[in-house]
Amino acid sequence: MSDIHEHKILILDFGSQYTQLIARRIREIGVYCELWAWDVTEAQIREFAPNGIILAGGPESVTAENSPRAPEYVFNAGIPVLGICYGMQTMSEQLGGKVIQGVGEGEFGYAQIEMLTKSALFKDIEDAVNSEGKPLLDVWMSHGDKVSAIPEGFVAVAKTDTCPFAAMANEEKRFYGVQFHPEVTHTRQGMRMLSHFALDICGCAANWKPSSIIEDAIERLKKQIGDDEVILGLSGGVDSSVVAMLLHRAIGKKLTCVFVDNGLLRLNEAAQVMEMFGDHFGLNIIHVDAENRFLDAMKGVADPEAKRKIIGRVFVEIFDEESKKCANAKWLAQGTIYPDVIESAGSATGKAHVIKSHHNVGGLPDDMALGLVEPLRELFKDEVRKIGLELGLPYNMLYRHPFPGPGLGVRVLGEVKKEYCDLLRRADAIFIEELHKADLYNKVSQAFTVFLPVRSVGVMGDGRKYDWVVSLRAVETIDFMTAHWAHLPYDFLGRVSNRIINEVDGISRVVYDISGKPPATIEWE
């Protein structure tokens, strides 16, 4: 078995919104990488022993006092370095070049760079050719400051009309700087540039692939756990499902999964989880039907944050009770993924940008006295999905739209009642079914239905009915930080509305949410 961590790239984070994207791109190329704050020590870099280092972008100005700098060792380690945007600027400044502050002439968005000379980073790459026969590349810029003089030993590799050094290189030392962002899809040949850096310049082998990751994870789990037993909270979501499958492969029946049905899941979801993991894959699952317990705890509570806290508290209570029944369990498995690790790592100086993410599991009792097993802690979400497919989990389950941890608890507005949840489940199932039938499900990023605790008059036959209102919500987004409402066809929306009103007794009106994020959020609560 090849060592999937043998070749690796270190990415230093200076606070760019794109930094995690760089890491994901390097992983997609097949090379392991880690993302650390910019203020790491020489000892930490030596211990990690990377084959190359990428200095990522950042929001600060190299010209400002006390702005972040790469550790000097980065340029003395004898390994290739790629500076991206701010990373190029700090590389230039630290090695004797000059950076000037942008005065109203920064470049933001699409740009075309003209190649001035050949470079290993841009080998055989061009998007077009200008009238002078010079190769042109379509790239994505996002910078105010710019390099005005490059360090000794460097050459200008590319330029734009307003940026004389859009790319620079010291081929002898294998130092490269690009003012644009190769990691974003708008830079058409960005993946090829990153591939040249990781595979050709740094000499990494592409060992980081789903089958190898699974093999490595199973071996490590066997070593860590030995003959002990493990307990896992299985929700049916992507992360816990993939953890369950990895542990099942590694230790078989020594894994006990606790599936808590809180009554806030999607239509037939509890039955589907039990059928898939219990009947089909043969996992050992304790099924706790706790619908009444959750609903009783939320009785009379309308505040969304209070509802979230109650749902979290009751889950912890139940999981604690069930874990005590598994007296032989020595380990607790969690679906922690790499973005969670990045968030909690932070920075030695406190200056580095901290990327926020939602922790998979939190608030479990400190007195559980169990060791922690986190087989996904090196993986991004897209990697978790890929290894889930390799482990035999169905595509439709792994690539479902996001579902909030509190479930329908935050999609029923105000107080949560069983009647409301049942109506919402059925309405939502119709919406999702119709999206699939119209081949629209994978064209939107997230779609769901919200129950509004208001009654509206409707006409059924010769009579009137006074029933509840639901809102359909569908958005398009790249990162869920901002989102546009999806412009679904009117005839499609009409069909969904008619089906819900005719098939779900208790709903008399369907509306469509056309709010973007910002100013609205994607979820209503």
From Swiss-Prot:
Subunit structure: Homodimer.
Presence of the UniProt keyword Nucleotide-binding in the record: yes
Entry-linked InterPro entries: Class_I_gatase-like, GATASE, GMP_synth_C, GMP_synth_GATase, GMP_synthase, GMPS_ATP_PPase_dom, NAD/GMP_synthase, Rossmann-like_a/b/a_fold
Pathway linked to the protein: Purine metabolism; GMP biosynthesis; GMP from XMP (L-Gln route): step 1/1
EC number: 6.3.5.2
Taxonomy, superkingdom: Bacteria
Keyword set, alphabetical order: ATP-binding, Glutamine amidotransferase, GMP biosynthesis, Ligase, Nucleotide-binding, Purine biosynthesis
Protein's organism: Shewanella sp. (strain W3-18-1)
Function text: Catalyzes the synthesis of GMP from XMP.
A Gene Ontology molecular function term of the record: GMP synthase activity
Residues binding ATP, per UniProt: 235-241
Cellular component terms (Gene Ontology): cytosol
Pfam families: GATase, GMP_synt_C, NAD_synthase
Record's protein name: GMP synthase [glutamine-hydrolyzing]
PANTHER family assigned: GMP SYNTHASE [GLUTAMINE-HYDROLYZING] (PTHR11922:SF2), GMP SYNTHASE-RELATED (PTHR11922)
GMPS ATP-PPase domain: residues covered: 208-400
Every Glutamine amidotransferase type-1 domain range: 8-207
ATP-binding keyword on record: yes
Catalyses which reaction(s): XMP + L-glutamine + ATP + H2O = GMP + L-glutamate + AMP + diphosphate + 2 H(+)
Catalytic residue list: 85 (nucleophile), 181, 183
